[in-house]
Amino acid sequence: SITILLASLQLSAHKPVLRFNQEGRFKIAQFTDMHISVDKSDYCNEQAEKTFARLSRVANQEKPDFIVFTGDIVTRGDTRKGWQRLLDSLSTYKIPFCVTFGNHDPESGLSREEMSRIITSSPYSVNSLNSAGQLADMDLDVLSYSGDKPSMALYCLDSGDYSPDKSIGKYAWFSMDQILWLRNSCLKKTQENDGNVLNSLAFFH
């Protein structure tokens, strides 16, 4: 079974391996729109501490196998310090995680490339960089407990920030290249799974 917890708001040189446990369970905690702001004001610091406390409570009580952050994570204040504080917290939990950007993350004062380098510096991050040095769209296999065959697929996609065409809206959307990539990835996984569609979840802002 799969459990997803939604909250608004083996360490090696290799990426962590995602795997169902012996009971056939894989628990995911999802955090979104956290809008962490460090050292902007006393109020923002107070709210940030509440957010970190909530993250700690979920990590320690629910003990998820994987954490997904779906955008608008660290958006104001000393954003480099905010990201480092978040990564330090995740290192204490030793839980693999993935980040997708939201529309407000690029407003934080750090470029997408800078944020991407910070995120991928963590040994618990499953994110990788694309050719532009930004977080790549990810297709992640969750393996069965006893083998190396995927039992489920997770897709983490960047939905962009601002519209390239202001006449049709303020914020961006998935590109056709992303849609084709997702379609082809799903088809490939189906073929590799003896023609059976692999159970999948997609995460994005």
Question: Can you say where each PLM-predicted feature lies in the sequence?
Answer:
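Intrinsic structural disorder
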Residues: 8-9, 163
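Extended active-site neighborhood of metal-dependent phosphoesterases/phosphodiesterases
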Residues: 15-17, 84-197
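Sec/Tat-exported extracytoplasmic proteins
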Residues: 35-38, 59-63, 90-94, 186-193, ...
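N-terminal active-site segment of His-dependent metallophosphoesterases
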Residues: 13-85
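Short, solvent-exposed beta-strand-terminating loops
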Residues: 20-21, 201-205
